[in-house]
Amino acid sequence: MRIVIDGMGGDKAPEEIIKGAVSALDSYEDIELIITGIEKHLNRELNKYNFPEDRVKIIPASEIISMNESPSKALRKKKDSSIVKGINLVKEDKATAFISAGNTGAVMAGGLFLLGRLPSIKRPAIATVFPSRNGGTLVIDAGANVDSKPENLNQFAIMGQIYSKHVLGVKNPRVGLLSIGEEQAKGNQLTKGAFSLLDEDKRIINFVGNVEGRDIFNGSCDVVVCDGFVGNVVLKTTEGAASYIFDLIKDTFNKNILTKLSGLMIKPFLKKQMALVDYRQYGGAPLLGVNGVVIISHGSSNSTAIKNAIKVAKETVNKNVVGLIKQEINKDGE
């Protein structure tokens, strides 16, 4: 399996990208990596490690799409960027998946315009795993579409159900629609319209109705469906809240010598619990609905996140998620 990585994408590129890539080579013997980016910078980092050189190839890219660039303009103007060259390798069947911690909008636009949508898919969506009591809840869409229609949410549910079942290993995923109350009458025009479609669609086997924001974390459902505007707000709010809580805990244990000693005693336990809500453990989020495997990683990804993103890409390819979505979306939901 050949996976291509954007070597210049993210706040910690290329150092952490290369470190994570080399670590993945040790863990997954069935993968080969193509790394796109500025050759001298990539080679400088690769020279720090021992690795099987026959399993790594650099594809030079002279341009970088920065985080604050307009995605559409950057794609048009920067044809020799690490993102464009990487996605084109998937398009040309020279790689099976693409991973980037770079400009999310550019990666989404590249996936959509270079790879294209799957037949019958109206909008692609980002599927992000949130920590929960049952191990993880998939939220879809987490930011690809700020405006959606009920039929879009219906398709998001089908794609999320497939990913949850085949990649996350949930036997019979419970699908919930994010709203402001559990009752069917609650919500806005979008959620009310989506509820009717989800409730009637036989392709969605286990629709549990409306769910609230707290249900993402309490384990009462496995897939939470929403539009990308709401999903991204939930994502950023969760990240901010987690960071704030960690800071509060730190401040509490740093107050005096007694609290510091208490902190040292429970540090191993806290470390273990904090790892459960660390985005790095989840690696990256697939852009579902495009004609290829595209994994979007957090802009602050370190080597652990990149290694886990490679794992996500590998499993998404192995489970034939793209093929399953193509097959399921064309079935009659009546």
From Swiss-Prot:
<comment type="pathway">
    <text>Lipid metabolism; phospholipid metabolism.</text>
</comment>
<keyword id="KW-0963">Cytoplasm</keyword>
<keyword id="KW-0808">Transferase</keyword>
<keyword id="KW-0444">Lipid biosynthesis</keyword>
<dbReference type="InterPro" id="IPR012281">
    <property type="entry name" value="Phospholipid_synth_PlsX-like"/>
</dbReference>
<dbReference type="GO" id="GO:0043811">
    <property type="term" value="F:phosphate:acyl-[acyl carrier protein] acyltransferase activity"/>
</dbReference>
<dbReference type="GO" id="GO:0005737">
    <property type="term" value="C:cytoplasm"/>
</dbReference>
<protein>
    <recommendedName>
        <fullName>Phosphate acyltransferase</fullName>
        <ecNumber>2.3.1.274</ecNumber>
    </recommendedName>
</protein>
<comment type="function">
    <text>Catalyzes the reversible formation of acyl-phosphate (acyl-PO(4)) from acyl-[acyl-carrier-protein] (acyl-ACP). This enzyme utilizes acyl-ACP as fatty acyl donor, but not acyl-CoA.</text>
</comment>
<dbReference type="GO" id="GO:0006633">
    <property type="term" value="P:fatty acid biosynthetic process"/>
</dbReference>
<comment type="subunit">
    <text>Homodimer. Probably interacts with PlsY.</text>
</comment>
<keyword id="KW-0594">Phospholipid biosynthesis</keyword>
<keyword id="KW-0443">Lipid metabolism</keyword>
<dbReference type="GO" id="GO:0008654">
    <property type="term" value="P:phospholipid biosynthetic process"/>
</dbReference>
<keyword id="KW-1208">Phospholipid metabolism</keyword>
<comment type="similarity">
    <text>Belongs to the PlsX family.</text>
</comment>
<dbReference type="Pfam" id="PF02504">
    <property type="entry name" value="FA_synthesis"/>
</dbReference>
<dbReference type="InterPro" id="IPR003664">
    <property type="entry name" value="FA_synthesis"/>
</dbReference>
